[in-house]
C-alpha cells in the first residue's frame, strides 16, 4: 500500500478491513455473516485448492465473479495464481533463496506469471521442490515475512509490472467496497 502511494498510485481505501478466513472452506460462514449484517464484502482467492462447492454457493449470497469475487489469476493471467504470483519471479526467488539457501531454484521456470503455462502458482511449485529436495515443509509465511521486510526497506526494488498488478488489484477491491 505504502509503495503504491509513494509512486502516485491509489492504495487500498482506509475503510477496507482484511479478514483472513483460514482457507476457502471457512469462506461461506464469514461471507454469510458479512452479508447478513449488510456489510459490503469482497472475496480474494487463489485459484488452487478451492473446495468443490464453495464457488457454487457464493452466488447465493450475492458474491460471484464480477460482483465481489476476485481471483489472483485475474491479475496475472495465470490459472492457479496466488498472491506470490503478483511479484516478479526474480524478487520472490531472492527471498526464497535467503530462507532456503540450498534450494535449486533453477528447476523452477523464471518466466513471468503470464508466460508460465502451469496451473499452479509459484509458491506451490516451490513447495513441491522444498518437500521433494529437502524433506521439509515449505513455510510460505517465512518467505512472506522476508518479502514484507524487503519491500519496507527498499520499496524501489519492486518493478513496474508488480506495482501495476497490485494497483489493478487494489483499484478493483476499492471499487467493490
Regions found by a protein language model. Give the residues of each.
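Terminal low-complexity/disordered tails
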Residues: 117-177
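Activity-critical C-terminal alpha-helical subdomain
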Residues: 46-138
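Generic structural signal for hydrophobic core residues of well-folded globular domains
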Residues: 3, 90-91, 95, 99-100, ...
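Residues at structural and domain junctions
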Residues: 16-20, 69, 73, 112, ...
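Residue-level recognition of the N-termini of beta-strands and the immediately preceding loop/turn
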Residues: 13-17, 67, 138, 142-143
Amino acid at each position: 500500500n505504502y509503495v503504491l502511494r509513494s509512486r502516485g498510485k491509489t492504495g487500498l481505501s482506509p475503510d477496507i478491513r482484511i479478514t483472513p478466513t483460514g482457507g476457502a472452506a471457512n469462506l461461506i460462514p464469514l461471507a454469510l455473516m458479512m452479508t447478513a449484517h449488510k456489510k459490503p464484502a469482497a472475496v480474494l482467492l487463489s485459484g488452487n485448492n478451492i473446495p468443490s462447492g464453495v464457488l457454487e454457493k457464493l452466488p447465493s449470497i450475492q458474491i460471484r465473479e464480477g460482483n465481489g469475487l476476485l481471483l489472483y489469476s485475474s491479475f496475472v493471467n495465470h490459472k492457479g495464481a496466488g498472491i506470490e504470483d503478483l511479484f516478479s519471479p526474480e524478487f520472490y526467488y531472492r527471498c526464497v533463496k535467503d530462507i532456503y539457501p540450498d534450494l535449486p531454484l533453477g528447476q523452477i521456470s523464471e518466466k513471468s506469471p503470464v508466460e508460465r503455462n502451469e496451473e499452479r502458482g509459484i509458491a506451490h511449485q516451490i513447495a513441491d521442490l522444498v518437500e521433494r529436495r529437502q524433506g521439509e515443509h515449505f513455510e510460505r509465511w517465512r518467505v512472506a515475512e522476508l518479502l514484507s521486510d524487503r519491500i519496507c526497506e527498499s520499496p524501489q526494488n519492486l518493478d513496474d509490472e508488480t506495482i501495476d498488478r497490485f494497483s489493478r488489484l487494489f483499484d478493483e477491491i476499492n471499487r467493490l467496497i
